[in-house]
Structures are given as structure tokens and as C-alpha cells.
Swiss-Prot record:
Highest rank taxon of the organism: Bacteria
Reaction(s) catalysed (UniProt annotation): D-glucose 6-phosphate + NADP(+) = 6-phospho-D-glucono-1,5-lactone + NADPH + H(+)
Homology family: Belongs to the glucose-6-phosphate dehydrogenase family.
Gene3D superfamilies to which the protein is assigned, alphabetical: Dihydrodipicolinate Reductase, domain 2 (3.30.360.10), NAD(P)-binding Rossmann-like Domain (3.40.50.720)
Name of the protein: Glucose-6-phosphate 1-dehydrogenase
PANTHER family referenced in this protein's UniProt entry, alphabetically: GLUCOSE-6-PHOSPHATE 1-DEHYDROGENASE, GLUCOSE-6-PHOSPHATE 1-DEHYDROGENASE G6PD
EC number in record: 1.1.1.49
NCBIfam families for the chain: zwf (TIGR00871)
Keyword Oxidoreductase carried by entry: yes
Enzyme class: oxidoreductase
Coiled-coil ranges from the UniProt annotation: none
Record: residues binding substrate: 180, 184, 218, 237, 342
């Protein structure tokens, strides 16, 4: 299904996200004919560029990063325009009014406008207000939609204040809070796996599942983002948004119908059902860590405190592990172990469903565990692990697997997260975007962790290239469980 005809306005068009993700995503949608010809892209930033220079910059980016060439590239670039605007100056937004009118008339886009805030978070409230002051939020001529990047607030209080500020000019149905994790194919397939297969849904509860672990690991450090990262840390950067949303999709009830409101209702219910964290929880079920120098992929790397832009006495966490529970009928008593960190041995995001063992071990006390591994990135796919008889005498069981990889689908075109989410926003499908009640529930849940950090909670060192502090292993071992050590999901076909 194609996107609706519209003008896409990218605020922060001279920034890294526009070059790396947004323009390549729009180009690829154009290449597979999901945009058609009746669209335009207006880049907006303070940098003094014109249409020609902006097109050339984007053209070189697409050649370098996407291997773009030929007529398709030139035609796409002809849809790109630029307007220099001081985004902090309300009066300067007057320049956008005639420019957008001209583009809507040229491309017959009927006033439909998608605003993308690829800017520092300090402008998330300013830009909607400035658009509203010039009437660029009104839907009297076509729809107006606003995509807001993370972080949506710094804590519960600032998130609620930002909502109030944006809602003065844009209604909730116009606001699309983007989380690129939810645009990944495997996350979406999790819902199909659960709700369309009779194998899984009857087992997806406390009666059959022992525990669930969710891992969001990165092998890189903070790179050139030391100053930004030090103000957020692993909890704000990954856990509060990405991983809590993934947890909610693992645990949610079946929606009544597949539409944005029903899906997001169920996500919000899960977040509201998370057992509130007590002081005892944050002291005994939470591990915060910070990497020190070590070896990653055979290369010696510096510690966090040595990174550019990081204060020498920073107590910002680069690792977090938490045991949490959901207080409802389906999940009562099932622990969810969630961890994320930088400078770990591999870049991998996965969900592991650990099923309970048989009531009585007929063949062996050490029979292989039944588990379902859902790999979100990289090497997206699903693997079922279970026990079968080892060839030879006796009845010794060994672990075997049944594996599926998206890369093995002949002719499959798997959209990137930004391609999928941009297309959905242009179609008016908010299913994979966070709603305000879910955002507030997530911030409410993590507030005790923020308080613990502010009070100087314990921070463990871990060597770069390891799977985090040994305290995280002890956390899960207290209940006789272990973290999976992610490696290749499965062997690739040759």
C-alpha cells in the first residue's frame, strides 16, 4: 500500500539522522514505488543552504550509503527542497507558509503535511508551538502529523510537561512518538507468531513459562556522543523506551482487532500492570554498571571515563539489568529479566522465552531446556530449542533447534525500521508509535530507578568485552537461572 500524497518537512535536516536514516529510508520507499510521484521533502534547519546544495548533499549521501545511481536517484532528488529557518525564532517560521503552499500546489498534496522533529529534545515543545502560531498545525486543508524522536522527556514530570506543551497545538491523533525498535520486522512478527499460531498462545502464560529475558546489547561505546550519553545513560537511552516497549509486546493480551487504538490499549495495560519498584527492589533486583578499558573484537578499547565528552568522575551507567514482574492473571510469578549495555561482546537484541521443565525428568536430570529465541537484530529470525535423543545407545538427550531466518526468504524485501515507520505515518497508521498514556506509564515505572541513581546508588565496574558486571549474573542466579550468552542465532545456509 502506497503512502498518501504529502509534503514531508524534516526539522534538523542538516543533522546526522537525516543523512543516515531519514533520506535513505525515503529514497528506498520511492525506489519500491511506495511514495509514487506526488510527494515532496522540505528540509528545514538553521544552516544556510538552497535547494540545489541540499539536493547535492543528499545525492552524495545516497550514492555513498545506499549505492544509489541512475534515473531513480535523480528523480528522487528532484523532490527535495530546503528552507533555512531559525527554529528557535517564532517569527522565522513565517517563511514556511508560502513555501509549503507552493509545494502543495506543485505536487497536488492537498495540504497533507508530515513534520519530523529530527532536532535536539529542547526544541520538541518549541517547534509545535511555532507551527501552531502560524496555523501550520490546522487540518482545515489536509492532515497534519508530527513525528517526535526519543527521548520524550527526561523523567515523568518533564514528559508530562512536554505533552501539555505539544497538546496545545496538536491533538493526540496527530502525534507520532517514534521508537525505531518497534519498526523492526521481528518485533512485529512477534505478534503474528503469538496470536495466529495455535502452538504458542496456549503456552504463553505463567503455567508453561518459567522466565523471560530481554537483551539489548551493543558492542560499541558512546563514540562521539559522550556529552549527550552522559546525560541519559543506559536506563534512559535504551530501557525506558525501547526495551519496555518490547516487553509490553511480549506480554500484551490479544487485541480485539488489529488497529492502532486496540494495539496501543493492550501495550498500555501491560505497562500499568508492572509491579511498582520498591526501595528493596532497586537495591536487590537492579544492577547498574559502567565499562572500564578492555578488549572488544580483538581491539583494546578505552573505558567510559576516558571517552571524549565524559566528565572524569561521571556516575552515569552504561549497563543496566533489572528483574521485574507483571501483576496480572497471565504473568503472575513469572520474572522478566531485562538487560542492556554498551561495550558488550556483541551487538544483539533478542527475547528468550524459557519454558518450564517437565514435571518429572524421565530421561535425565540435565535434559535440554525448551526455549524460544526471537532475534530482533542482527540476523533477524526465530529459533526453537528442545531436546531429542542423542544417536547411539541409551536415552541421553541433546539440544537441537528449528530455525527461521528472514534472510532465507527468497525474494523477501524487508523494510528497515525507519522505512516502515515513515510509511505508516504517511498512511496514518499509529499502531507502532507510542501513545501518551504508555509513555507516562513507562516513566512512572522507572522513577524509583531515577531516584536511586540520584541518591548515588551503587555502580559496578565491568570490563569492556564482557557481558557486564558479575553482579548481574548473581542477580539472575539467585533464583537458579542464568542469562543466555547470545552468539549466532543459527548457521547460515550455504
Amino acid at each position: 500500500m502506497k503512502a498518501e500524497n504529502c509534503c514531508i518537512v524534516i526539522f534538523g535536516a542538516s543533522g546526522d539522522l537525516t543523512y543516515r536514516k531519514l533520506i535513505p529510508a525515503l529514497y528506498n520507499l520511492y525506489k519500491i514505488d511506495r511514495l509514487g510521484e506526488d510527494f515532496s521533502v522540505l528540509g528545514v534547519a538553521r544552516t544556510e543552504l538552497n535547494d540545489k546544495s541540499f539536493r547535492e548533499k543528499m545525492r552524495q549521501t545516497l550514492i555513498k550509503n545506499e549505492g544509489a545511481k541512475g534515473e531513480c536517484l535523480e528523480q528522487f532528488c528532484s523532490h527535495l527542497y530546503y528552507q533555512a529557518v531559525n527554529t528557535a525564532d517564532k517569527a522565522d517560521y513565517a517563511k514556511l507558509v508560502p513555501r509549503l503552499d507552493e509545494l502543495h500546489d506543485t505536487y497536488r498534496t492537498e495540504g497533507n503535511t508530515l513534520y519530523y522533529l529530527s532536532t535536539p529534545p529542547s526544541l520538541y515543545g518549541v517547534i509545535p508551538e511555532c507551527l501552531g502560531e502560524h496555523g501550520l498545525n490546522k487540518e482545515d486543508r489536509g492532515w497534519k502529523r508530527l513525528i517526535v524522536e526519543k527521548p520524550f522527556g527526561y523523567d515523568r514530570e518533564t514528559a508530562e510537561a512536554l505533552d501539555i506543551q505539544i497538546h496545545r497545538f496538536f491533538e493526540e491523533h496527530q502525534i507520532y512518538r517514534i521508537d525505531h525498535y518497534l519498526g523492526k520486522e521481528t518485533v512485529q512478527n512477534l505478534l503474528v507468531l503469538r496470536f495466529s499460531n495455535g502452538w504458542f498462545e496456549p503456552l504463553w502464560n505463567r503455567n508453561f513459562i518459567d522466565y523471560i529475558e530481554i537483551t539489548g546489547a551493543e558492542s560499541i561505546g558512546v563514540e562521539e556522543r559522550g556529552g549527550y550519553y552522559d546525560g541519559s545513560g543506559a536506563m534512559r537511552d535504551m530501557f525506558q523506551n525501547h526495551l519496555l516497549q518490547v516487553l509490553a509486546m511480549v506480554a500484551m493480551e490479544p487485541p480485539v482487532i488489529i488497529n492502532a487504538n486496540s494495539m496501543r490499549d493492550e501495550v498500555a495495560k501491560v505497562l500499568h500492570c508492572l509491579r511498582p519498584l520498591t526501595q528493596e527492589d532497586v537495591e536487590h533486583n537492579l544492577v547498574l554498571g559502567q565499562y572500564v578499558a578492555g578488549e572488544v573484537d580483538g581491539e583494546w578499547v578505552k573505558g567510559y571515563l576516558e571517552e571524549k565528552g565524559v566528565p572524569p568522575y561521571s556516575t552515569t551507567e552504561t549497563y543496566m539489568a533489572l528483574r521485574c514482574e507483571i501483576e496480572n492473571w497471565r504473568w503472575a510469578g513469572v520474572p522478566f529479566y531485562v538487560r542492556t549495555g554498551k561495550r558488550l561482546p556483541a551487538r544483539v537484541t533478542e527475547i528468550v522465552i524459557h519454558f518450564k521443565t517437565t514435571p518429572h525428568p524421565v530421561f535425565s536430570q540435565n535434559a535440554p531446556e525448551n526455549k524460544l529465541i526471537i532475534r530482533i537484530q542482527p540476523d533477524e529470525g526465530i529459533s526453537m530449542r528442545f531436546g531429542l535423543k542423542k544417536p547411539g545407545a541409551g536415552f541421553e538427550a541433546k539440544e537441537v533447534s528449528m530455525d527461521f531466518r528472514y534472510a532465507d526468504l527468497a525474494g523477501a524485501t524487508v523494510m528497515t525500521a525507519y522505512e516502515r515507520l515513515l510509511l505508516d505515518a504517511m498512511k496514518g497508521d499509529a499502531t507502532l508509535f507510542a501513545r501518551t498514556d504508555a509513555v507516562h506509564a513507562a516513566w512512572k515505572f522507572v522513577q524509583p530507578i531515577l531516584n536511586y541513581k540520584a541518591q548515588g546508588g551503587r555502580l559496578y565496574d565491568y570490563e569492556a568485552g564482557t557481558w557486564g558486571p558479575t553482579a548481574a549474573d548473581k542477580l539472575i542466579a539467585k533464583s537458579g537461572r542464568v542469562w543466555r550468552r547470545p552468539s549466532g542465532l543459527m548457521k547460515k545456509k550455504v
